[in-house]
Amino acid sequence: ISYAIDQGINFIDCANIYGTMDNRANIGQSEIILGRAIKNRRDNLVITSKVCSSIGSGANDSGLSRYHILREIDRSLKRLGTDHVDIYLIHAPDDRTPLAETLRAMDDIVRSGKARYVGCCNFPAWKVCQSLWVADQLGVDSIVGIQNPYSLLNRRLELEMFDLLTEMELGMMAYSPLAVGLLSGIYQPSQNPPIGSYWAQHLDQFTKQMQANEGQVIETLIKLAQEISKTPAQLAQAWILSRPEVTVFISGSDSISHIEDNIGAVGWKIDSQIMKELDEVSASFAT
């Protein structure tokens, strides 16, 4: 984390549910680790956290009720060692709780100074539109941006969401830009996934995807990246940043080399012919 900040990265995404080693038994640990890393550097960073996911078996241990939201923001701030997050995100829709109750609670958090802005994750376009309308009717702080998956292998946001983002001037945080590593260059359709990797543990699904359109996208990405002396991960993520609707992509890094690879996705533009090839080969994932 410190190395990433030293290289100029200033946006770090977190959540109350995130633990270590993807183990939900360790929930909250990511915020604790992040809090230690950003100590004395907080003012130069944009930090997010999230609320909704289950953090226990109790009746108030999940969802978007006022009780859960107000309790979890305090817990997140304590773990992060800060008095505010820059964007507090609704992690997922909660059909059990009235949207008005959720938005009022989020507004209270902004008014109290515990968050600067409010956003949402994993909402379809109609739900974002509904949230904007309800917030307007209530006269409360509205969402300023969304966080949804977007990549060469998942372009569904282009159907409705992108037009909404442009019209309402909302920010877009694209997560899973490498499609769980499929676009990283580590995986190739003609080869078995590396032993111990995520897709080696999901071999049947991997094989099925590589025989479909995913395999063609990956082969094209690798070929084009080689032609311009970039890595597949850099090209895949630069393609995301080329979209005017996208504000930032969120990419996980397990090592300094991964951080350096991700940083190599910014600061340059993709040639129009390469853009055309990537758009065409991945067109089926925009439907």
Label the model's feature ranges:
Residues I12, V85, V118:
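Glycine-centered flexible beta-alpha turn that most often forms the glycine-rich phosphate-binding loop
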Residues I55-L70, H91-T97:
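Active-site mouth loops of central-metabolism enzymes
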Residues L77-T97:
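Active-site groove signature of glycoside hydrolases
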